């Protein structure tokens, strides 16, 4: 059973946490999975801005992902 911990929606796409270290993008019209992204760190939050998904992981790590493709754009460690 899927435990939904975090969800963000933009432009007909829902990005949801599908495990502590994984997110999926779902097309809200069709219900089809668009992409899945896995990380090495526990995800604390998901947000979307300007067609970029931002994952906050382990307090200081921020991972930016393209909303349409699921490809990682950038990863930052905030000191």
From Swiss-Prot:
InterPro entries in the cross-refs: Quinoprotein_ADH-like_sf (IPR011047), WD40/YVTN_repeat-like_dom_sf (IPR015943)
Record key words, sorted: Plasmid
Protein name stated in the entry: Uncharacterized protein MJECL22
